[in-house]
UniProtKB/Swiss-Prot annotation:
Molecular-function annotations in GO: rRNA binding; structural constituent of ribosome; tRNA binding
Residues with the 3-methylthioaspartic acid modification: 89
Compositionally biased residues, Basic residues: 113-126
PROSITE patterns according to UniProt: RIBOSOMAL_S12 (PS00055)
Name of the molecule in the record: Small ribosomal subunit protein uS12
Protein's job: With S4 and S5 plays an important role in translational accuracy. Interacts with and stabilizes bases of the 16S rRNA that are involved in tRNA selection in the A site and with the mRNA backbone. Located at the interface of the 30S and 50S subunits, it traverses the body of the 30S subunit contacting proteins on the other side and probably holding the rRNA structure together. The combined cluster of proteins S8, S12 and S17 appears to hold together the shoulder and platform of the 30S subunit.
Signal sequence extent: none
InterPro entries: NA-bd_OB-fold, Ribosomal_uS12, Ribosomal_uS12_bac
Keyword 4Fe-4S attached: no
NCBIfam families from the UniProt entry: rpsL_bact
Annotated GO biological process: translation
Residue numbers spanned by region Disordered: 1-26, 103-126
Amino acid sequence: MPTINQLVRKGRASETTKSKSPALQDCPQRRGVCTRVYTTTPKKPNSALRKVAKVRLTNGFEVISYIGGEGHNLQEHSVVLIRGGRVKDLPGVRYHMVRGSLDTQGVKDRKQARSKYGAKRAKAGK
């Protein structure tokens, strides 16, 4: 326990929190270009082929980003928007693709949670 005099001289050291998405550099999203689009397998006990892309961001960072939703149109040199948010069963994947912006199309025939997948509202007649 420090004395009052020690606190006057030094003060309390504030704990610095480590960012969970350092490549964004405190921005909500970042633009980038896909350098590789591929599938990878999750950790045990899950089993699937998860769609991911390696993206070079405008600030020079190269990150792995998850492509959510069913089906996508991304390939090498696609310009994409990245947001934070990790995928628990994919080690090293700390970012998500924003669907429906830039070169990334929204998910087709999506009825629920449309805003998360960049899907427009379906016509009432159909």
